[in-house]
Amino acid sequence: CAPMTRAPRWLTYSGEPAPGRPKMARTPSGEPAPQAPGGAVSPVVNRLVDPISRQVAAFQGEWAPLLQAWAASDAGRRLIAHVDARLAAGAIIFPAQVFRALALTPLSSVRVLILGQDPYHGPGQAEGLAFSVPAGQPWPPSLRNIVKELQRDLGCPVPSSGSLEAWARQGVLLLNTVLTVRAHEAHSHRGKGWEEFTSRIIQAINRQPRVAFVLWGKPAQKFAESLDKRHLVIESP
């Protein structure tokens, strides 16, 4: 592993669920019940149900002004109309909670931004946090690579779950360059307008005091040149 891909020594988060988090509720049939915004997403409900427009209107928190300003822009309106129209036509789109990363990691708490490409496109995988999968799901190769790097660099133990919610609650913004994807169609929503939204988020974080940016893949690395030199920037293929 080249030096530029190594994790900073102070990145010592555990992959375990956050202390005190309640167990997932279940329906009488034994299936996981839908969770409130910001909560864990069951494999049964990880497909998009609520239109993007509704999720934008309902979003609260520090990111709300930025999100609403983007949604009112030409690029935002086009993207929302595109995704909502496909959803209404019956397309299966992931994840269910598109803005979950922003809900769990407010701007003022961001210490690390891990930027990926687009959500996992298989059933039960994407849960609104880049690289994270719900507990009990097999780990995709990208997640295994992240854990392997943390083991090698920091000696972190292998977590029991592929959920990275604990990281998000400790200031690690787990963001993809593109926030939605059609089932079994990688990169299907690339170039539709999400990149402009991601750029606004990165600009906001770039104005913060020192932050570590971990840019995973070429689409993410396109943002490297716009980052202030006071930040730590780590790039990985």
List the predicted regions and their residue ranges:
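C-terminal accessory regions appended to core domains
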Residues: 10, 46-51, 64
